[in-house]
Amino acid sequence: MRELTKRQSEIYDYIKKIVQTKGYPPSVREIGEAVGLASSSTVHGHLSRLEEKGYIRRDPTKPRAIEIVSEQLDEVNVEETIHVPVIGKVTAGVPITAVENIEEYFPLPEHLTSTHNSDIFILNVVGESMIEAGILDGDKVIVRSQTIAENGDIIVAMTEDEEATVKRFYKEKNRYRLQPENSTMEPIYLDNVIVVGKVIGLYREM
């Protein structure tokens, strides 16, 4: 196998480390930050050289799709990943209209989904109304598509104004209560609510 330059070795070692610790490869931006390269095109150039030299394989149709293919592959604990669609944004504060289109695909370790992959999507959280449930501004919530919920479930709901929000769900006698997990905020009371899905997991980039 052809020899690597110092910079290529740094990038290759970083990719291996992230795959070992997280189970999936880093993004181009993360690689650049790790090795001190501000230009994404420069990072892409080094990745192309690594690919030409037979150290990695890439799928240009998917983000983060970097596969280690050197003779050291057996040393790397690679967890199976799935590419989950990121569907717009949903607020965890004052509701905003959800953008019902796929913005990107995000790789997740398969064990985080624990259900049929086609039923899973991700929403980016904006706001602080769920902080006491450990859901912070900027987190990605992993959501299973479903139209029913039980009391106490954390759900993605569409309100009567066709706004999307993440809240804890309660069905009361004559209404629904969408309860924030922030003691400084008031619940939302609704006559009708559409359950879009149940939050089954959380991803946070450290």
Curated annotation (Swiss-Prot):
A Gene Ontology molecular function term for this protein is: serine-type endopeptidase activity
Query: Which residues does the Swiss-Prot or TrEMBL record annotate as the active site?
Result: S129 (for autocatalytic cleavage activity), K167 (for autocatalytic cleavage activity)
Could you tell me which InterPro entries the record lists for this protein? ArsR-like_HTH, LexA, LexA-like, LexA/Signal_pep-like_sf, LexA_DNA-bd_dom, LexA_repressor, Peptidase_S24_LexA, Peptidase_S24_S26A/B/C
Reactions it catalyzes: Hydrolysis of Ala-|-Gly bond in repressor LexA
Q: Which Pfam families match?
A: LexA_DNA_bind, Peptidase_S24
Q: Which UniProt keywords apply?
A: Autocatalytic cleavage, DNA damage, DNA repair, DNA replication, DNA-binding, Hydrolase, Repressor, SOS response, Transcription, Transcription regulation
Among the GO biological process terms of this entry, one is: DNA repair
| Residues of the site described as Cleavage | A92, G93
Q: Which domain of life is it from?
A: Bacteria
Q: Does the keyword DNA damage apply?
A: yes
Class in the EC hierarchy, top level? hydrolase
Give the matching CDD domains: HTH_ARSR (cd00090), S24_LexA-like (cd06529)
Q: What is its EC number?
A: 3.4.21.88
DNA-binding region listed in the record: 28-48
Into which family does the record put it? Belongs to the peptidase S24 family.
Q: What NCBIfam families does this protein map onto?
A: lexA (TIGR00498)
Q: Which HAMAP family match?
A: LexA (MF_00015)
**Subunit-structure text:** Homodimer.
- What does the UniProt record say this protein does? Represses a number of genes involved in the response to DNA damage (SOS response), including recA and lexA. In the presence of single-stranded DNA, RecA interacts with LexA causing an autocatalytic cleavage which disrupts the DNA-binding part of LexA, leading to derepression of the SOS regulon and eventually DNA repair.
UniProt protein name: LexA repressor
What organism is this sequence from? Staphylococcus epidermidis (strain ATCC 35984 / DSM 28319 / BCRC 17069 / CCUG 31568 / BM 3577 / RP62A)
Give the gene that encodes this protein.
Answer: lexA
